[in-house]
Design a protein with these regions (language model features):
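Intrinsic disorder/low-structure terminal segments
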Residues: 3-5, 20, 27
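Intrinsically disordered, low-structural-confidence terminal and linker regions
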Residues: 1-13
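Long, non-catalytic terminal segments
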Residues: 14-24
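Active-site region of the double-stranded beta-helix
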Residues: 23-132
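Conserved small/polar residues in nucleotide/adenosyl-binding loops
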Residues: 134-136
Length: 136
């Protein structure tokens, strides 16, 4: 390694067993939610594929206590996610995805900013999603 140490700026540490996070002093956050393979099968290219039982863990609305009032005032939400290593069939481990609705506060959908704290990531995003019904 080159000796570079990444400073996350917040005392949140990913843990592997059980998958999740620990929060340090002055940090708030909810109980971690674990997404299992069975939970996301419908979103996968091959819903019958093999892969890690625990695919990822997520904690939404985390932050420093000193910023809590400001985050709420600005309607900002900070979340953390950790993923299992491996594949889901032929595709990389990933989340099940989601759609952002238009915020009545701002008039636009919620932006997302990603920081990769360790490892490598592929981030796939699409600008628009539409539901199509097929009548048989």
């Amino acid at each position: 390694m080159n000796g570079f140490v990444f400073d996350k700026g917040i005392d949140i540490t990913p843990v592997q067993s059980p998958m999740g996070f620990t929060y340090g002093a002055g940090v708030f956050g909810p109980e971690v939610e674990i997404r299992r393979l069975e939970d996301i099968r419908a979103s996968l290219r091959d819903p019958q594929c093999k892969g890690p039982e625990q695919v990822y863990s997520i904690a939404m609305d985390v932050g420093k206590e000193e910023h809590r009032v400001l985050l709420n005032k600005l309607h900002l939400l900070f979340g953390v996610v950790t993923y299992s290593a491996g594949k889901l069939g032929q595709e990389p481990v990933r989340s099940q995805g989601h759609i952002h609705k238009i915020s009545p506060y701002s008039g636009w959908s919620t932006p997302e900013i990603y920081e990769i704290w360790s490892g490598e990531a592929i981030i796939y995003m699409q600008e628009y999603a539409e539901l199509s019904l097929i009548h048989i």
